[in-house]
Amino acid sequence: MEQYHGTTIVSVRRGNQVALGGDGQVTLGNIVMKGTARKVRRIYNGKVLVGFAGSTADAFSLLDRFEAKLEKYQGNLTRAAVDLAKDWRSDRALRRLEAMLITADRETTLVITGNGDVLDPEGGIAAIGSGGAYAQSAAKALVENTELAPRDVVEKALTIAGELCIYTNTNFVIETLE
């Protein structure tokens, strides 16, 4: 059976603001199954943003576990992410999950990979998914050459990714924290 795949998630941090956005397309093989999926959410009483790419069921499983880790560590994003990554690497069932997460709170942005890596992106920009490289490139250019707010950078970066990546559409969900 073919896997559901394809999306673009991008995060931009500038000053005291962070924005995280994603498109809404879910693809099975060469068929668009849904165009309005919500892959970016607020969790932990609205204090943490999370976006996911990869297999939808796998991403929801990881999201549930990540929320539990945030509760365990009282909202400490880094400790929750590292503990989730440890579990991901050591648990046989979790190792088979095919998803990635970008998480952000007021101070920190982290990418959690399927290999169990926790990465703090350089320059305040992170992107994952099939259109991630397009979105990251666009966001980097916009951050370096404009004074746009993070939300505007995310929207423009997703628009560019949506124009270039066949697995990304232009139905965006964008969340911000200040």
UniProtKB/Swiss-Prot annotation:
The protein's enzyme class: hydrolase
EC number in record: 3.4.25.2
GO biological process, one term: proteolysis involved in protein catabolic process
Name the record gives this protein: ATP-dependent protease subunit HslV
Family: Belongs to the peptidase T1B family. HslV subfamily.
UniProt source species: Cupriavidus pinatubonensis (strain JMP 134 / LMG 1197) (Cupriavidus necator (strain JMP 134))
Subcellular location as annotated: Cytoplasm
SUPFAM superfamilies (alphabetical): N-terminal nucleophile aminohydrolases (Ntn hydrolases) (SSF56235)
GO terms of molecular function: metal ion binding; threonine-type endopeptidase activity
